[in-house]
């Protein structure tokens, strides 16, 4: 497994906020670029809860899992 930083996660920078998801729109779907670890430089799609904007740094516990793409009904 790749080395983790002292906080127990992998740093990722938010590069795009795609939209809201969840039953009541409480989660945001974002694209982020992994800054360290095995998947360094990879752009992944994740769901996150709470306020987030472009340029924020998130700590991801794992970088291999991606969120499903948003669809409209």
UniProtKB/Swiss-Prot annotation:
TM region(s), chain numbering: none
Ribosomal protein as UniProt keyword: yes
GO biological process: maturation of SSU-rRNA; ribosomal small subunit assembly; translation
One MF annotation (Gene Ontology) recorded for this entry: structural constituent of ribosome
Keyword Isomerase applies: no
UniProt keyword terms in alphabetical order: Ribonucleoprotein, Ribosomal protein
Cited SUPFAM superfamilies: Nucleic acid-binding proteins (SSF50249)
GO CC field: cytosolic small ribosomal subunit
InterPro entries associated with the record: NA-bd_OB-fold, Ribosomal_eS28
Family matches, as Pfam families: Ribosomal_S28e
Family label: Belongs to the eukaryotic ribosomal protein eS28 family.
Protein name (record): Small ribosomal subunit protein eS28
Organism in which the protein naturally occurs: Methanosarcina mazei (strain ATCC BAA-159 / DSM 3647 / Goe1 / Go1 / JCM 11833 / OCM 88) (Methanosarcina frisia)
């Amino acid at each position: 497994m790749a080395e983790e930083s002292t906080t127990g996660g992998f740093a990722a920078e938010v590069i795009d906020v795609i939209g809201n998801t969840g039953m009541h729109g409480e989660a945001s779907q974002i694209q982020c670029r992994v800054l360290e670890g095995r998947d360094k430089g990879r752009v992944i799609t994740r769901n996150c809860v709470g306020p987030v904007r472009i340029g924020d740094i998130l700590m991801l516990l794992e970088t291999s899992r991606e969120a499903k793409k948003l669809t409209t009904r």
